[in-house]
A protein has these predicted regions:
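Long, low-complexity, charged/polar intrinsically disordered regions in eukaryotic proteins
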Residues: 1-26, 30
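Long, charge-rich, low-complexity alpha-helical segments
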Residues: 22, 35-99
Protein backbone atom coordinates (compact mmCIF):
# COMPACT_ATOMS: atom_id res chain seq x y z
CA UNK A 1 0.00 0.00 0.00
CA UNK A 2 1.49 3.37 -1.00
CA UNK A 3 1.96 6.02 1.68
CA UNK A 4 -0.99 8.34 2.25
CA UNK A 5 1.17 11.41 2.71
CA UNK A 6 3.71 12.81 0.25
CA UNK A 7 5.62 16.07 0.08
CA UNK A 8 2.98 17.30 -2.39
CA UNK A 9 0.07 16.53 -0.05
CA UNK A 10 -1.77 19.26 1.81
CA UNK A 11 -2.58 18.44 5.43
CA UNK A 12 -4.74 20.12 8.06
CA UNK A 13 -5.77 19.24 11.61
CA UNK A 14 -9.25 17.78 11.72
CA UNK A 15 -11.88 19.84 13.49
CA UNK A 16 -12.87 16.73 15.44
CA UNK A 17 -10.10 17.02 18.03
CA UNK A 18 -9.18 18.98 21.12
CA UNK A 19 -5.56 19.90 21.79
CA UNK A 20 -3.73 21.55 24.66
CA UNK A 21 -0.26 23.03 24.58
CA UNK A 22 2.14 22.58 27.45
CA UNK A 23 5.73 23.77 27.76
CA UNK A 24 7.46 22.13 24.81
CA UNK A 25 4.69 19.65 24.02
CA UNK A 26 1.07 19.21 23.01
CA UNK A 27 -1.57 16.60 23.80
CA UNK A 28 -4.42 15.84 21.43
CA UNK A 29 -7.69 14.04 22.00
CA UNK A 30 -9.14 12.73 18.76
CA UNK A 31 -12.91 12.82 18.98
CA UNK A 32 -13.51 10.58 15.94
CA UNK A 33 -12.04 7.46 17.56
CA UNK A 34 -11.28 8.59 21.10
CA UNK A 35 -7.52 8.49 20.58
CA UNK A 36 -5.09 10.31 22.87
CA UNK A 37 -1.85 11.55 21.34
CA UNK A 38 1.16 13.34 22.83
CA UNK A 39 3.76 15.25 20.80
CA UNK A 40 7.23 16.46 21.77
CA UNK A 41 8.62 19.91 20.93
CA UNK A 42 9.13 19.29 17.22
CA UNK A 43 5.80 17.47 16.94
CA UNK A 44 4.12 20.40 18.71
CA UNK A 45 5.75 22.74 16.17
CA UNK A 46 4.31 20.64 13.34
CA UNK A 47 0.90 20.56 15.06
CA UNK A 48 0.87 24.36 15.25
CA UNK A 49 1.57 24.55 11.52
CA UNK A 50 -1.22 22.16 10.49
CA UNK A 51 -3.95 24.22 12.14
CA UNK A 52 -4.35 25.72 8.66
CA UNK A 53 -4.03 23.72 5.41
CA UNK A 54 -0.36 23.52 4.47
CA UNK A 55 1.65 21.56 1.95
CA UNK A 56 3.94 18.96 3.53
CA UNK A 57 7.00 20.35 1.73
CA UNK A 58 6.32 23.73 3.37
CA UNK A 59 6.15 22.07 6.79
CA UNK A 60 9.47 20.34 6.08
CA UNK A 61 11.04 23.66 5.08
CA UNK A 62 9.78 25.32 8.28
CA UNK A 63 11.29 22.53 10.40
CA UNK A 64 14.62 22.79 8.59
CA UNK A 65 14.64 26.54 9.21
CA UNK A 66 13.71 26.21 12.90
CA UNK A 67 15.74 23.13 13.94
CA UNK A 68 19.16 21.66 13.23
CA UNK A 69 18.31 18.41 11.50
CA UNK A 70 19.51 16.59 8.39
CA UNK A 71 17.26 17.07 5.37
CA UNK A 72 16.66 13.35 4.76
CA UNK A 73 15.96 12.63 8.44
CA UNK A 74 13.59 15.60 8.66
CA UNK A 75 11.66 14.42 5.63
CA UNK A 76 11.35 10.79 6.71
CA UNK A 77 10.44 11.65 10.32
CA UNK A 78 7.87 14.22 9.18
CA UNK A 79 6.20 11.81 6.76
CA UNK A 80 6.10 9.12 9.48
CA UNK A 81 4.55 11.56 11.97
CA UNK A 82 1.92 12.73 9.50
CA UNK A 83 1.09 9.12 8.52
CA UNK A 84 0.60 8.33 12.21
CA UNK A 85 -1.56 11.41 12.79
CA UNK A 86 -3.64 10.43 9.75
CA UNK A 87 -3.99 6.84 11.00
CA UNK A 88 -5.32 8.25 14.29
CA UNK A 89 -7.72 10.50 12.31
CA UNK A 90 -6.15 13.68 13.70
CA UNK A 91 -5.35 15.25 10.32
CA UNK A 92 -7.05 15.32 6.96
CA UNK A 93 -4.96 14.80 3.81
CA UNK A 94 -5.48 16.19 0.34
CA UNK A 95 -3.26 14.51 -2.25
CA UNK A 96 -1.57 16.35 -5.07
CA UNK A 97 -4.40 17.09 -7.55
CA UNK A 98 -2.01 16.47 -10.48
CA UNK A 99 -1.84 12.75 -9.62
Amino acid sequence: MPPLVSLDSTVVATTEQISAHFTGSVVILGLRVGSYYSLDEVGAFVWSLVQEPLQVSDIRDAILEEYEVEHARCESDLLALLEDLAANQLIDIESDPRI
